[in-house]
Amino acid sequence: MTCQLARFYGLPLRSSGVCAANVPDGQSIWETSNSLWAAVQSGSNIIYHAAGWLEGGLIASPEKFIMDCEIIQQIQRYMDPEIFSTDTDSIAISAIKEVGSTGHFFGVEHTQSRYENAFYQPFLSDWKNYEAWEAAGAVWTPERAYKIYQQILN
């Protein structure tokens, strides 16, 4: 209700992320992700405690900060107005006509011109399949986040 009142009266709105987890694990990610989605979709102007928090703010974790930055980047990409564009070119009416019911979209210029940047590219998440991930050392997300954190410091 607070968000609705703020929007109605044109007032700025602040909200915050939530994370009660004690370590940068699955619980910490879903708590942060869910609270950030709610904060962003409510129309908050500023979101406090959005990254790096554990144990309700009693612990500041560099690894969790890196992990949360990727969540924020993914949300930011999803909320990009281009994602929701419904103009004729964006929804590919000409490509749909060109492909018809028997073709495929990979050979169409509309797809080719957008393919490189149409998808979010994570800087932390590992999108390899299990076998490839295992062959590469089976490095868990917090470990990868720690390496990125160390690279930033150095």
Model segments located where?
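Glycine-rich anion/phosphate-binding loop at the beta-strand->alpha-helix junction
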Residues: 1-71
